[in-house]
Amino acid sequence: MNLSIKENKETVRPVFPFTAIVGQEEMKLALMLNVIDPKIGGVMIMGDRGTGKSTTIRAIADLLPKIEIVKDDLFNSHPSDVDLMSDENKHALQNGINIDKAYIKVPMVDLPLGATEDRVCGTIDIEKALTEGVKTFEPGLLAKANRGILYVDEVNLLDDHLVDILLDSAASGWNTVEREGISVRHPARFVLVGSGNPEEGELRPQLLDRFGMHAEIRTVKDPELRVQIVEQRTNFDQDPKKCIENCAKDQIKLKQQIADAQLLLSTITIDYDLRVKISQVCGELDVDGLRGDIVTNRAAKAYAAFNGQQTVNSSDISKVITLCLRHRLRKDPLESMDSGEKVEKVFNKVFNLEEI
């Protein structure tokens, strides 16, 4: 009972408005594009301490419209999309059994650093399965995060094996748990957001490459901007309700823009010539594999949809290509140029642009 009370309190806890966040445009753009198209593959946010990483991630989750689920379902199953529902609900749908529906806020799940594999994936009661022949599954954090956002702070300190599991589930949209020959599978489609401080160590390149985007954020140096950030935070801490009310109009406008972009996304086209140039940039940067090409195409379409366009242009690509490729470049200790600057330089050369 006490746990239930605690959860209810957390649900009504005021969240700093996304539209009130000053600066950090790169991080905000990466999060919005992943929300518009979760197939981009999540975002890794690396930056200094105290730069608003956690605040921004919680704010984007709070901004999103409510989702329709099967009532009291442990996996946030979609009531009609079979790719987003559990086997039990799929069976009920196929047999014409009436399914009760409900609306909830987009799930925002925090993965603690000390989490075990069982806590993340869920557990099967082997004893009950063997003695009674009943599959009893205790869902983990991946089930809770289905159709939502899974946030891992200090992901660079997380066990590599767990990072692998998260990335596999995020890419496939499913979580499979196998114990002693017994297998349980459930939908686990979520936006994976990792954050960390580069001073505390980097992720292995093989794992970093699996993140769709990589945003780098730095402490704001402009004194006027710093004052504005401090004022915004102070106003929110003193009177959260008033701060949220002041931002309500901008929040509603952005929420609608994201919802419209999600609907428009499937109709967006990108010319063959532009696709060739994207691959040319990846080739000249010596990017391993094809993930860079695929993610850049998806991100450019999501950006075009966000702006209400029907087709992708070179300006759209310029806004997303650094986010999609900077973490895929091979590390050269003798290279003085920042990886982001290198991507921009090659992009301008391939697209015959001096500056965007």
Curated annotation (Swiss-Prot):
GO biological process, one term: chlorophyll biosynthetic process
UniProt-listed SUPFAM superfamilies: P-loop containing nucleoside triphosphate hydrolases
Catalytic activities: protoporphyrin IX + Mg(2+) + ATP + H2O = Mg-protoporphyrin IX + ADP + phosphate + 3 H(+)
UniProt signal peptide: none
Classification via InterPro entries: AAA+_ATPase (IPR003593), CHLI-like (IPR045006), ChlI/MoxR_AAA_lid (IPR041628), Mg_chelatase_ATPase-isu (IPR011775), Mg_chelatse_chII-like_cat_dom (IPR000523), P-loop_NTPase (IPR027417)
Enzyme Commission numbers on file: 6.6.1.1
Binding site for ATP: 47-54
Pathway it works in: Porphyrin-containing compound metabolism; chlorophyll biosynthesis
Recorded GO CC terms: chloroplast
Superkingdom of the organism of origin: Eukaryota
Swiss-Prot/TrEMBL keywords: ATP-binding, Chlorophyll biosynthesis, Chloroplast, Ligase, Nucleotide-binding, Photosynthesis, Plastid
Any GO molecular function: ATP binding
Major localization listed first in the record, in broad terms: plastid
Pfam family, one: AAA_lid_2
Intracellular or extracellular location(s): Plastid, Chloroplast
Family the UniProt entry places it in: Belongs to the Mg-chelatase subunits D/I family.
Function: Involved in chlorophyll biosynthesis; introduces a magnesium ion into protoporphyrin IX to yield Mg-protoporphyrin IX.
Protein name: Magnesium-chelatase subunit ChlI
Taxonomic source organism: Porphyra purpurea (Red seaweed)
Gene: chlI
